[in-house]
């Protein structure tokens, strides 16, 4: 990845516009319920302030209607929380492209402000050129640090970087890309990927891409049911996609053709209903009844997969292998989590459900790298080019798109 890095750019006295991903969950009362993304941005913010920059932070929050102020999507709670974490006043600036510009002109070296939700600006999602130029005019240096939105070509993530005097990657973005590159571009072998979730259709391109790269492709959740069906077993009334059986068979064949494999469950945990209170039964995959729903992998499968993970050199994890929110069907995901934690492999995990599972089983400090990106993490796994990263690479080469 050939990009200019923030740490290599002189920032003292410069107006520095940093795009972070501060899109945090909030409850109905407007209180932040998980500040992981805010905390992840702190090293970048502190480094810019320590350099004597005049720091302006940009982010989106939620999906408000463009061009309309919506109190529920205001970054005011984020600015207040940043004030607490940084131990200093972090004002929120509204209408920052127009009337609020006067406030930005008053910034001194070492000051920091939060700019109100970028999605209140008409043209943000369409990467509008005029809007991008107005944003770029606010700064001497643009820092793209939001890996979680790097897969979106929008004005605040992509367009602004094309027109800013200097465009560079922030430490968080650099760390994310370095970790993903280490896992996929030159991995320590064996490389094991865990791809789970409810539907094959949503992760088909990822499965196909990884089948060519990995030594073992572990499938779980509803995705595994389609693969079990592809192997000739019944899955009862489980969530599965029968029309994608040929795709599943092709993925298995592709993995085996290059010496890899897709290890399928030998036993599963089933129930008659998708419910926390439904009685759970463990059975062989040959014994799934017509009215059964597969809701987790069984203990034999968990042991087999655990052994594979403990011997891995690199692990990429996206998705829980069962309905881990229900304790009766959490055993498989817990076993996977424990195996990842105990493995000496370089491990990277991403996706909301995966991170929730990591937190539930308290292995945060045992995973080498936990990605802050959901969609961006998946698109990187697919082998897609992330627009914001492509823009930074083009700027580093001295070209514009």
Curated annotation (Swiss-Prot):
RNA-binding keyword on record: no
Annotated ATP binding sites: 203, 325, 351-354
GO MF annotation list: ADP binding; ATP binding; phosphoglycerate kinase activity
Pathway where it operates: Carbohydrate degradation; glycolysis; pyruvate from D-glyceraldehyde 3-phosphate: step 2/5
Positions of disulphide bridges: none
Chief location: cytoplasm
Pfam family of the protein (one): PGK
Residues noted as binding substrate in the record, renumbered to the chain: 21-23, 37, 60-63, 119, 152
Subcellular location: Cytoplasm
Reactions that this protein is recorded to catalyse: (2R)-3-phosphoglycerate + ATP = (2R)-3-phospho-glyceroyl phosphate + ADP
Keywords linked to the UniProt accession: ATP-binding, Cytoplasm, Glycolysis, Kinase, Nucleotide-binding, Transferase
Signal peptide from the UniProt entry: none
EC code: 2.7.2.3
UniProt GO cellular component terms: cytosol
GO biological-process terms attached to the record: gluconeogenesis; glycolytic process
HAMAP family per UniProt: Phosphoglyc_kinase
Similarity-based family: Belongs to the phosphoglycerate kinase family.
Subunit annotation: Monomer.
Name the UniProt record assigns to this protein: Phosphoglycerate kinase
Gene: pgk
């Amino acid at each position: 990845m050939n990009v200019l890095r923030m740490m290599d750019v002189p920032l003292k006295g410069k107006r520095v516009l940093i795009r972070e991903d501060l899109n945090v969950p909030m409850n109905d009362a407007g209180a932040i319920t998980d500040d992981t993304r805010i905390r992840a941005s702190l090293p970048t913010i502190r480094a810019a302030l320590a350099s004597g920059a005049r720091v302006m932070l940009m982010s989106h929050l939620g999906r408000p209607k463009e061009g309309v102020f919506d109190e529920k999507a205001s970054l005011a709670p984020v600015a207040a929380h940043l004030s607490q974490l940084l131990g200093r006043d972090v004002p929120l600036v509204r209408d920052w492209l127009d009337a609020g510009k006067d406030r930005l002109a008053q910034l001194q070296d070492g000051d920091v402000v939060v700019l109100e939700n970028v999605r209140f600006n008409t043209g943000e999602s369409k990467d509008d050129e005029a809007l991008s130029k107005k944003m770029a005019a606010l700064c001497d240096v643009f820092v793209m640090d939001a890996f979680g939105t790097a897969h979106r070509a929008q004005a605040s993530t992509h367009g602004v970087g094309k027109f800013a005097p200097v465009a560079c990657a922030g430490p968080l973005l650099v760390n994310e890309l370095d970790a993903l590159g280490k896992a996929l571009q030159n991995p320590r072998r064996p490389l094991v990927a865990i791809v789970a979730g409810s539907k094959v259709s949503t992760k088909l391109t990822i499965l196909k891409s990884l089948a060519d790269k990995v030594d073992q492709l572990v499938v779980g959740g509803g995705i595994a049911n389609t693969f079990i069906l592809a192997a000739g077993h019944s899955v009862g009334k489980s969530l599965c996609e029968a029309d994608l059986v040929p795709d599943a068979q092709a993925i298995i064949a592709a993995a085996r053709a290059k010496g890899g494999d897709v290890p399928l469950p030998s036993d599963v945990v089933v129930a008659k209903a998708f419910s926390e209170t439904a009685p759970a039964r463990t059975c062989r995959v040959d014994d799934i009844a017509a009215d059964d729903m597969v809701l987790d992998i069984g203990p034999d499968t968990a042991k087999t997969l655990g052994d594979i993970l403990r011997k891995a050199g690199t692990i990429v994890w996206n998705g829980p292998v069962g309905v881990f929110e229900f304790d009766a069907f959490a055993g498989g995901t817990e076993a996977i989590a424990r195996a990842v934690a105990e493995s000496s492999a370089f491990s990277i995990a991403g996706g909301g459900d995966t991170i929730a599972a990591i937190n539930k089983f308290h292995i945060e400090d045992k995973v080498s790298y936990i990605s802050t990106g959901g969609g961006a993490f998946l698109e990187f796994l697919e082998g897609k080019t992330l627009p914001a990263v492509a823009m930074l690479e083009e700027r580093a080469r001295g070209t514009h798109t």
